Amino acid sequence: MGEEAAMATMESAYHDELAPAAAPAPAKGGGSKKKRKQQKREEKRKECRLVSYHELPDYMKENEFILDYYRSEWPILNALLSLFSWHNETINIWTHLLGFVLFFGLTVLHLGQYFPQVADLIGHLSWPISKVAENVSSNIGDVLSGAASFMQASPASSAGAMAAAWPVTAAAAATTRWPFFVFLAGAMFCLLSSAACHLLSCHSHRLNLFLIRLDYTGIAVMIVVSFFPPIYYIFQCEPRWQVVYLSAITAAGVATVYALMSPRLSAARYRAHRALLFVAMGLSGVVPAAHAVAVNWHEPRRNVTLAYEGAMAASYLAGTAFYLTRVPERWRPGMFDLCGHSHQIFHALVIAGALAHYAAAIVFIQARDEMGCPAP
């Protein structure tokens, strides 16, 4: 019995030596909490890293010639904060965000001509915006020369000073401004929805699809509202043509948005189909444009407005060409990931086209203020 007990004791000791040492009990207090927080931070850091094109989920694969610096399925807060970091959407976001700020500034300036409270607000709060709008106008030169009288407000401008920049005469008061403000509002909606899409579509598949549809809607709205100032003011004395042309382009815009609500058309392979829908909407303006030229053949400002509208059309068509061909990144994949790729060029040309159309709208309004309509 004694020998058996000794053998059992030795065997137990042998197994104890082979057994792994027990893990030390977690320290009481904040040590374990700190470790857990550090682990969570590390996980979040890994989640929010920039990834390559091949690491993206299929729904985010839009341009295979941009190889790196993608945000993929980031938390919404991190996506928002990426506004201030460098990735392949940074310039896309800021071009249209700054464009929105510019058009917002122009809208506030023009509202100030009719509402003294807005004019006072410009004097106290909006000096930087008005200066940006003024500087952009002067840098563009002749293309925006027609808008110069709108930009003379000083930082302390009052309602009287605003009115002096563009006197609201009796004729002007009779010429409604709502089509002009419809254009400005549509431009702001397009630019802001585009910036939001590029900023937040990296969050999830569901939000990506929603924001892409919002972006397409913004483009369609921009095209539709661009028709309002020229058609309304050129055909102000012939209301039936106002109704015909504005109804037609609005219906075309609604039909285009409805077609683009299909998730299938959001896929990258339908890029050309989407672009052609928008181009068709824009080119539908050839008919009212030809009619307008015929009606105003002897109007001395005809060539000025045609130059502005030609600049707008050239900007939009060139932007569409970059969007479709994906040049220059197609030539050197990876070289233009962060700066200089086609979508960034497209964004810059959209801003240029919108500003050219803004200048044309100013000329249309001034011409209508001076001419009025002949007595029946």
Swiss-Prot record:
Keywords: Membrane, Stress response, Transmembrane, Transmembrane helix. Residues 20-46 are annotated as: Disordered. One of its GO terms (cellular component) is membrane. Residues 1-90, 201-216, 262-274, 325-344 are cytoplasmic. Its main location: membrane. The chain crosses the membrane at residues 91-111, 180-200, 217-237, 241-261, 275-295, 304-324, 345-365. Belongs to the ADIPOR family. This is Heptahelical transmembrane protein ADIPOR1. The lineage of its organism: Eukaryota, Viridiplantae, Streptophyta, Embryophyta, Tracheophyta.
